[in-house]
Amino acid sequence: MIRCKPLLGTYVEISVNETSPQYSERIANHAMDQAFEVIELVQKLMGFHNPDSELSSINARSHIETLEVHEWTFKVLSAAKEIHTLSAGLFDCAVGAKLIRAGLLPNHKNTQTIECGDLSNLILIKPNKVRSDKPIQLDLGGIAKGFAVDKGVETLKANGIESGSVNAGGDLRVFGNISKEIQVRSPTNPNELIPIGALEEGSIASTGLYYSKSRDDMNKLSYIVNPLNMEHVEFNGSYSILAPKCMYADALTKVFAISQNDSHPCFEHFSAQAIKITA
C-alpha cells in the first residue's frame, strides 16, 4: 500500500509492505495516518516559512529570553550542533539571514540589517530549553526533513508495520525485510533518474542545484551557503549520503557538497557513505 501527501515543501510518500503476515489494510491505514500526523507536527514545529512555528519563535526571541521548546525541536537542534562541531563548522543551519537577503527565505521580522550569530551562539539547556547569546536565524530545512522521515518510520513500527519506507522528496528511509531500488536525479536533467543500486534498512538523502538553476531562474543564488565564508556555493553534480538515520543523511549532504570531500572525517562518526553523480 502506498499513500502520498503534500508536506515539508514536497510530497511525502509512505509505503507499507503488504506481504507481511501481520498485514491488514486497517492496520496499515491507521499506521499511515499516525505517521503523516507526526510528520505534519515536525513541519508545524520547525518550518521557517510559518511565522507561527516554534522555529520562528526561536529566531525572533532566543537572544532576548530563554525559551522552552518541544522535545523534537530540542533533539534536532542538538543533532545540528553535534554535526556543526564534527564538521568543523561546515554544517551550520544558522545561515538563515544570508538566505533571507538572497530572497530564498521569507523575512518575517525584518532581520536583513541585523548582524546574526552562528550555531555556536545557540545554547541548549537540558531537557528542552534554548537561548542564544546573539540574534540568530536558524533554517532547519537541511536536517528537519530527514528527522521527519525518521519519526514517520518510528511511528509505522510502533503501530505494527514491520517493513516499508518513507520518502520525503528524495529523503528516503527503508526498513524491514525489503529493499528498494534507488534512483538519483541527473544533475544536468532533473527529469532523468540515474539508478545507483538498492537500499535495505537504511537511509539516503541527496542535494543538487538542478531545481534552483532551472531555465526560469538562472539568476537565482544557490540555496547552499558555505558557513565559513558565507558565500553561496555553486556546484555541479548530485551529492548523496547513505546513513542509518535519515536526519544525518540529510544534514551530511551539505557537508559533502561544500567540502567536495567524499571521505570527510565526520562521515565515519555517523556510519555514513558518500556518493557523487557528476554532471
Residue ranges and their predicted role:
Residues 1-279:
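Mature catalytic core of soluble alpha/beta enzymes
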